[in-house]
Regions:
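Conserved beta-strand-loop surface patch within small alpha/beta domains used
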Residues: 1-104, 113-166
């Protein structure tokens, strides 16, 4: 089962990254899954969200991440907020168990017509899950078909360059 990145994470494998200076790589099928999910939510006027699994690697530049899969379950959502249904957590954990990758390394959610950024609530959510460890948030706005990736630390959010792996 993938686990959330933590200080107790196993030794990180050394592997040279595909593009210098980029710390986030996302499998194309994950992009398709997230954007399809966001489009469905948009058609129902509801935000969506899910978790991202993959692996952390390191090279001479430092640590970088490959997102290989995503997981979600039933959601309680409206046009400005979303959360996992309490009764759907077992389904979420089962979904994570089937994911590629060895860690939960991020999360995704949508904003409906307000652009791609992390709100104060999003930042608190992200910091509550990942703290200052490696962790990424991807925000999708299906109204204009955009998405952006972010990381957070005590100083706030930072937009992160992302490469899609085909």
């Amino acid at each position: 089962m993938p686990k959330i990145i933590s200080a107790e994470s196993p030794e990180i494998e050394y592997r040279k990254r595909p593009v210098k200076g980029v710390s986030l790589y996302v499998a194309e099928e994950v992009i398709v899954t997230m954007t399809d999910h966001a489009e469905k939510g948009y058609n129902e006027n509801k935000e969506i969200m899910g978790l991202l699994t993959g692996q952390t690697l390191k090279d001479d530049e430092g640590i970088y991440v490959r997102i290989l899969d995503s997981a979600t379950s039933d959601l309680e959502a409206d046009e400005v907020s979303v959360r996992f249904c309490e009764g759907g957590l077992e389904e979420l954990f089962d979904s994570i168990d089937k994911c590629k990758g060895d860690m939960v390394i991020g999360w995704y959610h949508s904003h409906l017509g307000i652009g791609c950024y992390l709100s104060d609530v999003d930042i608190r959510t992200h910091m509550g899950i990942f703290g200052d460890e490696i962790g990424f948030a991807i925000v999708i706005d299906p109204s204009d078909e955009t998405l952006a990736a972010f990381s957070c630390d005590k100083d706030g959010q930072k937009k992160v360059p992302m490469i899609v792996l085909t």
